[in-house]
């Protein structure tokens, strides 16, 4: 008998909106897939390192109650897993008798710091003294929890990395959702400026701003926006905008011709392949990106509206110089900029909410069909 998701309750677990980029993704995602299901119930968490052991246990109990409240055989659990998202991970650990899927935001592992409670996060030596030497153990723990489940990555390179580490799992790749945002001025009518956008943390490349500024001509302005950017230092040719939402966010993207994504290695544990929420956000505003080829960014190209700089073994100064040259080659060329705008438009449609819902709907339907056949 064909699977009809409208007969199912979706139990959704993820960080609340504003709790890191994954929380923003979660808010867009759950609203996008809601029409697929008969019912959607949620358990939203705080960000990594913000919750106590008691709170983690509370989330686990709440998820169990949400599962029990659904019709037997008609409940599906989906979680958003990120490097330190302990509450989501431990909420799905050990669940039996109910199908569970998860989106892995920092592949190949869903979680890298399974003990990152508030106490552990507040003590750097404890945090890494515990997790770094126990990397093989944490990988085995995740293999026990998720090794034979269906996992979704937001890039093909991410999906391949999961399959290499957890060969028994079923892995799908669905591109990062691109949300609807207002249509702004054409790229060629915007000021000659580039933006840095996103949450400030290790690996996002905000430390490259000063180097890139030195390499750019004076008539190209850098504007910086996002959570945590208010603590950064501006200067001549560098405008710190700070956190933006709503109309302020619209205005920020309307003031730049491209967004720079100079990602590098996020942590020293292993290579990871996260998709970029900042790329998706830029594309939502029909704004191309200039980026490095770190992680999942390597999959992008001009047909997706991205000018990708292959950095190889370049040092930080060389990376900044290469990015600056790419920036100028794009924002100084109206014809090329307009062409990138057309590519962004096509990529937006391919990764829109409806296309994302269709892709996840297929993954869930196929998984539930396999589950029914195996029973």
Model-derived segments and spans:
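Nucleotide-sugar-dependent
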Residues: 261-280, 291-299
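Conserved donor-binding/catalytic core segment of Leloir-type glycosyltransferases
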Residues: 185-204, 210-213
């Amino acid at each position: 008998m064909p699977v009809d998701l409208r007969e199912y309750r979706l139990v959704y677990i993820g960080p609340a909106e504003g709790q890191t980029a994954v929380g923003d993704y979660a808010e867009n995602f759950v609203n996008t897939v809601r029409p697929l299901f008969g019912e959607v119930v949620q358990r939203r968490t705080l960000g990594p390192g913000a919750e106590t052991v008691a709170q983690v246990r509370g989330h686990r109990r709440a998820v169990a109650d949400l599962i029990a409240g659904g019709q037997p055989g008609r409940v599906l659990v989906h979680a958003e897993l990120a490097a330190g998202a302990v509450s989501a991970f431990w909420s799905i650990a050990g669940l039996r008798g109910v199908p569970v899927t998860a989106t892995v935001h920092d592949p190949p592992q869903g979680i890298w710091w399974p003990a990152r409670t508030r106490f552990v996060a507040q003590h750097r030596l404890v945090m890494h003294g515990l997790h770094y030497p126990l990397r093989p153990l944490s990988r085995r723990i995740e293999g026990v929890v998720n090794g034979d489940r269906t996992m979704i990555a937001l890039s093909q390179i991410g999906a391949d990395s999961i399959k290499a580490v957890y060969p028994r799992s079923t892995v799908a790749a669905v591109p990062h959702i691109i949300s609807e945002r207002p249509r702004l001025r054409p790229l060629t009518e915007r000021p000659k400026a580039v933006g840095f956008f996103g949450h400030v943390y290790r690996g996002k490349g905000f430390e490259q701003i000063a180097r890139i500024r030195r390499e750019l001509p004076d008539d190209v302005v850098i504007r910086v926006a996002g959570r945590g950017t208010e603590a950064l230092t501006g200067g001549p040719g560098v405008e710190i905008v700070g956190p933006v939402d709503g109309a302020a966010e619209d205005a920020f993207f309307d003031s730049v011709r491209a967004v720079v994504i100079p990602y590098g290695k996020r942590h020293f544990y292993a290579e990871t392949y996260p998709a970029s929420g900042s790329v998706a956000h830029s594309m939502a505003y029909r704004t191309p990106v200039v980026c490095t080829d770190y992680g999942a960014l390597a999959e992008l190209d001009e047909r997706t509206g991205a000018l990708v700089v292959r950095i190889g073994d370049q040092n930080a100064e060389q990376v900044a110089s290469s990015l600056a040259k790419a920036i100028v080659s794009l924002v100084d060329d109206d014809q090329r900029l307009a062409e990138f705008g057309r590519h962004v438009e096509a990529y937006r449609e391919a990764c829109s909410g409806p296309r994302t819902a269709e892709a996840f709907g297929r993954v869930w339907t196929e998984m539930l069909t396999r589950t029914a056949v195996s029973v």
